């Protein structure tokens, strides 16, 4: 297999300043991932910090908690504005949920109000679709858009880790499907019901995955995002 941590990939982010929403979740791992690609990674907690970044990552964690804290720290509205203005954003796991325009099974607060998202991606997601923590699993995925990493034998699959991950149940006409979990995946045949489930999508400058590339050391998804920021993908 080719090594995703090639010299070229370690320089692709040079000169870029990429923010990672650092309210909750595995934001540190994402900062390390973009820095491994040569970019400057910065934690984002305040509205003013959104002004000086080239792109933003919304990490995995608890989507309801990130939503709540984004209001407390008053970054929700400015972030939605930046997304509408075209800021490149990548969301992993909970980040995918928060970028979705619709949640099929939203959590509710004590008053019965459904959780909200930042939106931007014309998709419907289902939370914890693959099950709870004990149903976490790993698998290899064919992932579109990684041609820049092709070796003599083509593009290696992406090794993906799913931890209480969502899946996408609907995509709008402007959304490209990048990866799906095989319906015959051994550990989730009953859950998948014979349907290939969408776990990675892109629409314009927005990218989202159900899984956590920052956990496995798989840098190509972050490299794809960086190339999107540069207008090279």
Swiss-Prot record:
This is Pyridoxal 5'-phosphate synthase subunit PdxT. It comes from the Bacteria. GO terms for molecular function: glutaminase activity; pyridoxal 5'-phosphate synthase (glutamine hydrolysing) activity. It comes from Paenarthrobacter aurescens (strain TC1). L-glutamine binds at residues 61-63, 127, 163-164. Pathway: Cofactor biosynthesis; pyridoxal 5'-phosphate biosynthesis. The active site is at residues 93, 212, 214. GO terms for cellular component: cytosol; glutaminase complex. The keyword Hydrolase applies. The lineage of its organism: Bacteria, Bacillati, Actinomycetota, Actinomycetes, Micrococcales. Keywords: Glutamine amidotransferase, Hydrolase, Lyase, Pyridoxal phosphate. Catalyzes the hydrolysis of glutamine to glutamate and ammonia as part of the biosynthesis of pyridoxal 5'-phosphate. The resulting ammonia molecule is channeled to the active site of PdxS. Its EC number is 4.3.3.6, 3.5.1.2. Pfam families: SNO (PF01174). In the presence of PdxS, forms a dodecamer of heterodimers. Only shows activity in the heterodimer. Disulfide bonds: none annotated. One of its GO terms (biological process) is pyridoxine metabolic process. It catalyses: aldehydo-D-ribose 5-phosphate + D-glyceraldehyde 3-phosphate + L-glutamine = pyridoxal 5'-phosphate + L-glutamate + phosphate + 3 H2O + H(+); L-glutamine + H2O = L-glutamate + NH4(+). Belongs to the glutaminase PdxT/SNO family.
């Amino acid at each position: 297999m080719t090594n995703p941590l090639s010299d070229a990939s370690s320089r692709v982010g040079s000169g870029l300043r990429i923010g990672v929403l650092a309210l909750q979740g595995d934001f540190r791992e994402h900062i390390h991932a973009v820095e491994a690609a040569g970019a400057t990674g910065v934690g984002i907690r305040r509205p003013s910090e959104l002004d000086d970044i080239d792109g933003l990552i919304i990490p995995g964690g608890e989507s309801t908690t990130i939503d709540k804290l984004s209001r407390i720290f008053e970054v929700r509205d400015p972030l939605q504005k930046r997304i509408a203005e075209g800021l490149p954003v990548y969301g992993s796991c909970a980040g995918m949920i928060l970028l979705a325009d619709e949640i099929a099974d939203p959590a509710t607060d004590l008053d019965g109000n459904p959780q909200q998202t930042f939106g931007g991606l014309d998709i419907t997601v289902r939370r914890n679709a693959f099950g709870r923590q004990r149903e976490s699993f790993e698998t290899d995925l064919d992932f579109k858009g990684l041609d820049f990493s092709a070796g003599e034998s083509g593009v290696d699959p992406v090794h993906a880790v799913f931890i209480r991950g969502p899946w996408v149940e609907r995509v709008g006409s402007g959304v490209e499907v990048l990866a799906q979990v095989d319906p015959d995946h051994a550990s989730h045949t009953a859950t998948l019901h014979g349907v290939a489930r969408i776990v990675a999508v892109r629409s314009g400058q927005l990218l989202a995955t159900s899984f956590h590339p920052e956990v496995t050391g798989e840098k190509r998804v972050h490299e794809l995002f960086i190339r999107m920021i540069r207008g090279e993908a």
